[in-house]
């Protein structure tokens, strides 16, 4: 499977059986810069803390950098 990986947001080959993920959360700059984003791959969908959103998928390049709606 190919997944996008941060910080470069490049498509890389991950190990067989892995899933791609998109993890987003707010930090001190959330209101002006938007949510922080972490893209990668893992053996299983990562468990996250409260306040962190995670989306996992299992097709090539299914985790592109999320687009931000501009006001």
From Swiss-Prot:
Assigned GO CC terms: extracellular region
Cysteine-cysteine disulfides? 3-20, 14-41, 26-30, 45-56, 57-62
Keywords, comma-separated and alphabetical: Acetylcholine receptor inhibiting toxin, Disulfide bond, Ion channel impairing toxin, Neurotoxin, Postsynaptic neurotoxin, Secreted, Toxin
Localization: Secreted
Q: Which InterPro entries match?
A: Snake_3FTx (IPR003571), Snake_toxin-like_sf (IPR045860), Snake_toxin_con_site (IPR018354), Toxin_cobra-type (IPR054131)
Identify a single GO molecular function assigned to this protein.
ion channel regulator activity
Principal localization?
secreted
Q: Which family does it belong to?
A: Belongs to the three-finger toxin family. Long-chain subfamily. Type II alpha-neurotoxin sub-subfamily.
Q: What does this protein do?
A: Binds with high affinity to muscular (alpha-1-beta-1-gamma-delta/CHRNA1-CHRNB1-CHRNG-CHRND) and neuronal (alpha-7/CHRNA7) nicotinic acetylcholine receptor (nAChR) and inhibits acetylcholine from binding to the receptor, thereby impairing neuromuscular and neuronal transmission. Ranges of nAChR inhibition are in nanomolar (competitive binding with alpha-bungarotoxin gives Ki=1.66 nM on muscle nAChR and Ki=4.84 nM on alpha-7).
Q: What is this protein called?
A: Long neurotoxin Tx-NM3-1
């Amino acid at each position: 499977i190919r997944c996008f990986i941060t910080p470069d947001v490049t498509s890389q080959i991950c190990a067989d059986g892995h899933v791609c993920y998109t993890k987003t959360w707010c930090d001190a700059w959330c209101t002006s810069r938007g949510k922080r984003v972490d893209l990668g791959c893992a053996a299983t969908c990562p468990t996250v803390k409260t306040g962190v959103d995670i989306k996992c998928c299992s097709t090539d390049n299914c985790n592109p950098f999320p687009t931000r709606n501009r006001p």
